[in-house]
Amino acid sequence: MGRQNPSLVIMAEGMGSRFGGLKQIEPADPEGHIIIDFSLFDAWRAGFRDVVFIIKREMEAEFRECFGDRMERYFHVSYVFQELERLPEGISVPAGRAKPWGTGHALACCKGVVTGPFAVINADDYYGRTAVDFLAAQTDESCYADSNEMQA
């Protein structure tokens, strides 16, 4: 039995408060490509076939409009919602907290959707082909974090 193709998990839940909008879907070049387009192109070449977007529920319509048919021709696309209430049993949201918990919580929200090896990227960063190729080629059970290949 061969190794399962890895999933690409894209953290796109950010509130965009400093940017003033959804930076994740803003064009990054004159042709209208967004940063995620470049990451997905590299991911496809590296063998990723499943993409999971971690988003806010209220962003779903915009993401489906932006990525929907265009990306679903190449990838199996899933959307996961990072919601404050999705916490382990016995943990509760502190009064007044409105911001998401962070990366660990975002990945925990993928439980049941991501069932095999995966790589995680931020929607508004471009990591480059070398980084994506490296992550896709891993065959052991290790975890890797490398910011040396990241290009902002």
Give residue spans per PLM region:
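Conserved beta-loop-beta/alpha segment of the NTase-like Rossmann-fold superfamily
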Residues: Y74-H76, F81-A152
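Glycine-rich, phosphate-binding/catalytic loops in enzymes
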Residues: I25-D29, M71, L135-T139
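Polar low-complexity intrinsically disordered regions
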Residues: M1-G2, Q151
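N-terminal glycine-rich phosphate-binding loop and ensuing alpha1 helix
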Residues: G2-G68, V77, G116
